[in-house]
């Protein structure tokens, strides 16, 4: 069918639809219709897609978000993350995808505390410390850091195969007046994302592996600053250069160091250590970048 048909669908939204809804739905309709025409979709193709979408919903529950997994596999979450966190302040810590395993309200621990409520024999403990600052290096006291990770078997606390408490390997920490934080965790491990559902089927169609590199998740917030959602990646992990969800960025690849006799406070407690500083962009810089991007987009539409 012609572009005239597509235009009739795009302009059919009622007067109470918000401007943002009109913009997004019209754009979605245009791209979906173009996709169908470009690939000459058949009814069989369309039904396969409908079933795929249905299975995403059926596979999802409070412990698993299959929709996020599918978006990750096609790189959509990484793209949206980049657009969301665009800023003129180039020296802030890079963001990364949230992923499907975030849980709010993790336990608050004092600095130096451990998020390891229950360990398994293959877990390797690590101590992480650093400072949270603004992009000029000013310490940000009172910043909130939420961290979470999987165990060495590759399972997060809400997954059925994770043998541990609900908030195992999750915790919240508050920086001191000088912006310092510290906590005990595990040296991260790589793992395959769940591939027993439609996300896994899509990976097989794409002839891709399901493995994510070793990483720790972070969510860092402070009043007046843009909330940073990111991950740090182990430089020694073979999947750091071949992430199944395309989320790795060069400046959030880190090197874990072996604890030695110079680290008297850590010897006998953990095997590895990491010093890692975080820099937050102001919320205003993010909003200014978004406004500039929107202005550029509007100008392109008028051309």
Swiss-Prot record:
Q: How is the cofactor bound?
A: Binds 1 Fe(3+) ion per subunit.
Which Pfam families does the entry link to?
Answer: Dioxygenase_C, Dioxygenase_N
What are the alphabetically sorted keywords of the record? Aromatic hydrocarbons catabolism, Dioxygenase, Iron, Metal-binding, Oxidoreductase
Cofactor(s) this protein cannot do without = Fe(3+)
What is the reaction catalyzed?
catechol + O2 = cis,cis-muconate + 2 H(+)
Q: Which InterPro entries match?
A: 1_2-HQD/HQD, Catechol_dOase_N, Intradiol_dOase_C, Intradiol_dOase_core, Intradiol_RC_Dioxygenase
What CDD domains is this protein classified in?
1_2-HQD (cd03461)
> Which GO biological process entries does UniProt record here?
catechol catabolic process, ortho-cleavage; catechol-containing compound catabolic process; catechol-containing compound metabolic process
Q: What is known about regulation of its activity?
A: Inhibited by Ag(+), Cu(+), Hg(2+) and Pb(2+).
Instruction: Tell me how temperature affects activity.
Output: Optimum temperature is 25 degrees Celsius. Stable at temperatures lower than 40 degrees Celsius.
Instruction: Provide the E.C. number(s) assigned to this enzyme.
Output: 1.13.11.1
Main enzyme class: oxidoreductase
Q: What does this protein do?
A: Can cleave 4-methylcatechol at lower rates than catechol, but has no activity with 3-methylcatechol, 4-chlorocatechol, 4-carboxycatechol or hydroxyquinol.
The protein's name is Catechol 1,2-dioxygenase
Organism lineage string: Eukaryota, Fungi, Dikarya, Ascomycota, Saccharomycotina
Q: Which gene encodes it?
A: HQD2
């Amino acid at each position: 069918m012609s572009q005239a048909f597509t235009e009739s669908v795009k302009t059919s939204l009622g007067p109470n639809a918000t401007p943002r809804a009109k913009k997004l739905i019209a754009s979605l309709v245009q791209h979906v219709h173009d996709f169908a025409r470009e690939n000459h979709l058949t009814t069989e193709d369309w039904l396969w897609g409908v079933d795929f979408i249905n299975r995403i919903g059926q596979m999802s529950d409070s412990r698993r978000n299959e929709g996020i997994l599918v978006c990750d596999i096609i790189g959509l979450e990484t793209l949206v993350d980049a657009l969301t966190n665009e800023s003129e302040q180039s020296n802030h810590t890079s963001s990364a995808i949230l992923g499907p395993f975030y849980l709010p309200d993790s336990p608050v621990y004092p600095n130096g505390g451990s998020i390891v409520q229950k360990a398994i024999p293959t877990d390797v403990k690590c101590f992480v410390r650093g400072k949270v600052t603004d992009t000029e290096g000013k310490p940000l006291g009172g910043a909130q850091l939420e961290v979470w990770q999987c165990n060495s078997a590759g399972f997060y606390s809400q997954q059925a195969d994770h043998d541990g408490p609900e908030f195992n390997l999750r915790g919240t920490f508050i920086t001191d007046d000088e912006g310092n934080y510290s906590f005990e965790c595990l040296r991260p491990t790589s793992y395959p994302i769940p591939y027993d559902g439609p996300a896994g089927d899509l990976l097989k169609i794409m002839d891709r592996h399901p493995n994510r590199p070793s990483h720790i998740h972070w969510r860092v917030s402070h009043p007046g600053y843009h909330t940073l959602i990111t991950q740090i990646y182990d430089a020694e992990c073979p999947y750091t250069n071949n992430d199944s969800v395309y989320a790795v960025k060069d400046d959030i690849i880190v090197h874990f160091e072996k604890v030695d006799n110079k680290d008297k406070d850590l010897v006998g407690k953990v095997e590895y250590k990491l010093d890692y500083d975080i820099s937050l962009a102001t919320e205003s810089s993010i909003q200014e970048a978004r406004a500039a991007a929107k202005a550029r987009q509007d100008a392109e539409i008028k051309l």
